[in-house]
Amino acid sequence: MKGHVARKRFGQNFLVDQGIIAAIISAVDPKRDETVVEIGPGLGAITEPLMARVDHLHVIEIDRDLIARLKKQHTPERMTVHEGDALAFDFASIGKNLRLVGNLPYNISTPLLFHLAEYVDVVHDMHFMLQKEVVERMVAEPGNADFGRMSVMLQYRFYLEWLIDVPPESFDPPPKVQSAVVRLIPKPVSELNAKSQEKLSQVALTAFSQRRKMLRNTMKTLLSDAAFTELGIDPTCRPEDVSVEDYVRIANYLS
């Protein structure tokens, strides 16, 4: 890639497939006056078509070389460059009704998704390019081997939609993995039934800490067989066979 060498420590793989870029922009369908935030703009594959559709774009970038390039190419009137790590960024500082977009660095995608889940109150929606394996875990249903803590926590908080599959040759350099684009829309408060999201997270973390064992064994410090009976949940189930709704019921029972 002319002028910039992709840095492994930042997980940089730059999107170059114009067809995929167009499909992402079409899926996002940004409007002029919306607050759009791009995480990791890189060399601008998504940035440029986004800027053609919005009055002002916020970008979050950690690579100093790319920050300098962005500031040289765009005026502050059109673009606000937030310098730093998206994992530590306060998204609420930008405003509300944020539309987040990004080809997320695959080496930090999981912790970044959990970080972003803390800002659902200020987010309208999110469209992200991720490792396909991560998207499979996000949308997995109970009974599927991919169903885990991430599935529980993200499905509790968001409506998820798998939009586009993206092959390695769509990037420069090509990653060694398949990719996919996913849409996340925060659920309304009326659909969030957990008394404590922290307790739900603790329950999911405990349950999936030994995912091949029965719930009775993984959760013995939290629930007795009598409690499982009271909840109507089979204690001999494995963690991946329990629905999001049942994890919420367990968390509420313990809250």
UniProtKB/Swiss-Prot annotation:
InterPro entries membership: KsgA/Erm, rRNA_Ade_diMease-like_C, rRNA_Ade_Mease_Trfase_CS, rRNA_Ade_methylase_Trfase_N, rRNA_adenine_dimethylase, SAM-dependent_MTases_sf
UniProt enzyme class: transferase
GO molecular function, one term: 16S rRNA (adenine(1518)-N(6)/adenine(1519)-N(6))-dimethyltransferase activity
Keywords carried by this UniProt record: Cytoplasm, Methyltransferase, RNA-binding, rRNA processing, S-adenosyl-L-methionine, Transferase
UniProt GO cellular component terms: cytosol
Residues engaged in binding S-adenosyl-L-methionine: N13, L15, G40, E61, D85, N103
E.C. numbers: 2.1.1.182
Subcellular location: Cytoplasm
Recorded catalytic activity of this chain's protein: adenosine(1518)/adenosine(1519) in 16S rRNA + 4 S-adenosyl-L-methionine = N(6)-dimethyladenosine(1518)/N(6)-dimethyladenosine(1519) in 16S rRNA + 4 S-adenosyl-L-homocysteine + 4 H(+)
Pfam families named among the record's database cross-references: RrnaAD (PF00398)
Record family assignment: Belongs to the class I-like SAM-binding methyltransferase superfamily. rRNA adenine N(6)-methyltransferase family. RsmA subfamily.
Function: Specifically dimethylates two adjacent adenosines (A1518 and A1519) in the loop of a conserved hairpin near the 3'-end of 16S rRNA in the 30S particle. May play a critical role in biogenesis of 30S subunits.
PANTHER family per record: DIMETHYLADENOSINE TRANSFERASE, DIMETHYLADENOSINE TRANSFERASE-RELATED
HAMAP family: 16SrRNA_methyltr_A
Record-given protein name: Ribosomal RNA small subunit methyltransferase A
Organism, as annotated: Dechloromonas aromatica (strain RCB)
Gene name of the encoded protein: rsmA
